[in-house]
Amino acid sequence: MTNIRKSHPLIKIVNDAFIDLPAPSNISSWWNFGSLLGICLAVQILTGLFLAMHYTSDTATAFNSVTHICRDVNYGWLLRYLHANGASMFFICLYLHIGRGLYYGSYTYTETWNVGVILLFAVMATAFMGYVLPWGQMSSWGATVITNLLSAIPYMGTDLVGWIWGGFSVDKATLT
């Protein structure tokens, strides 16, 4: 008589994914960070979406909207802290994921490694845009500091900063 977990069509899917998973015997917790990255990204998207529903970017009301989120929105304080700390956890998991790849020699798979490098650059660009696009209290300062790092590039750095900003500097606390 055959085992039901290997013969039933629906249970077989669960069996193949969880019980008889073809994984090496020396797999460790270092291999969890890809999944943790996905969870952190989902948390960031969801909390950012809910925070954006209550945030206003006007210079006069930006701070008050953050106060409104923390005090008046149900679990708004939790959304704010999950979003802020989730970003840190995302990058910790990202760097540990890269470190695991370096430790185990995953860079020898050049196509896969190059896709990962491109994804890293895309994550960095997205993080920068996520920091600048809400156009909130510290965004102008953060964007100025980050983009002024480009001015360290010889010959063309100052032109790059001017090109990104459409001018050399921004004049308000928020970017509206």
UniProtKB/Swiss-Prot annotation:
DNA-binding keyword on record: no
Cellular compartment(s): Mitochondrion inner membrane
Chain residues that bind heme b b562: 83
Any one GO cellular component localisation term in the record: mitochondrial inner membrane
Positions of disulphide bridges: none
Positions annotated to bind heme b b566: 97
UniProt membrane topology term: Multi-pass membrane protein
BP GO annotations: mitochondrial electron transport, ubiquinol to cytochrome c
Keyword terms, alphabetized: Electron transport, Heme, Iron, Membrane, Metal-binding, Mitochondrion, Mitochondrion inner membrane, Respiratory chain, Transmembrane, Transmembrane helix, Transport, Ubiquinone
Quaternary organization: The cytochrome bc1 complex contains 11 subunits: 3 respiratory subunits (MT-CYB, CYC1 and UQCRFS1), 2 core proteins (UQCRC1 and UQCRC2) and 6 low-molecular weight proteins (UQCRH/QCR6, UQCRB/QCR7, UQCRQ/QCR8, UQCR10/QCR9, UQCR11/QCR10 and a cleavage product of UQCRFS1). This cytochrome bc1 complex then forms a dimer.
Similarity field: Belongs to the cytochrome b family.
Misc remark: Heme 1 (or BL or b562) is low-potential and absorbs at about 562 nm, and heme 2 (or BH or b566) is high-potential and absorbs at about 566 nm.
Protein's recorded name: Cytochrome b
Species of the source: Eumops glaucinus (Wagner's mastiff bat)
